[in-house]
Amino acid sequence: MAVRPIIRFPSPLLTTSAERIGRFDGTLRQLSDDLVDTMRAAPGIGITASHIGILQRLTVIEVDPQTGPRSFVNPEIVWQSSETAWHTEGSVSMPGVAEEVERPVRVRVSFQTLDGETREEEAEGLMAVCLQHEIDQLNGIFWIRRLSRLKRERAVKRFEKFNRAEAFPGTQ
């Protein structure tokens, strides 16, 4: 297991659709383990292979440390509720920035396990938000595209300011 470097916004890899996974082997398990380590180190509660520059349809989500991380291979939303709610979102690829995003409150997702078993399950609350956010990422939709133009521009400016402060501590 290893912490991998995270691709930062505005890399074009973050707006590129990931490829379906067809091989379920030790390499996939290793990638999943590395994603868990990288997500926790970021820190974050969700990450995709795209975030580390690997364009494969794998996401790891950990909304509750008690239940641990979950891996979703080739996830797809097959149903979503018409009821929506606003939630604060951000990205490990755009640290220092968070905004309110409106999403359906419940979703049903079809996915495969690390062993290749196909499953379908319904999620609500934070897990539903995370699944939608990470599946968007796998589809090449970076989260700020869900914002209004004005909010998106402000988010980018905040990120640029965060990057300057990170590169040159003590400056603004």
UniProtKB/Swiss-Prot annotation:
Stored InterPro entries: Peptide_deformylase (IPR023635), Peptide_deformylase_sf (IPR036821)
Active site (record annotation): E134
SUPFAM superfamilies xref list: Peptide deformylase (SSF56420)
Signal peptide: none
Domain of life (superkingdom): Bacteria
GO biological process, alphabetically ordered: co-translational protein modification; translation
GO molecular function, one term: peptide deformylase activity
Family note: Belongs to the polypeptide deformylase family.
Protein name as annotated: Peptide deformylase-like
Species of provenance: Rhizobium meliloti (strain 1021)
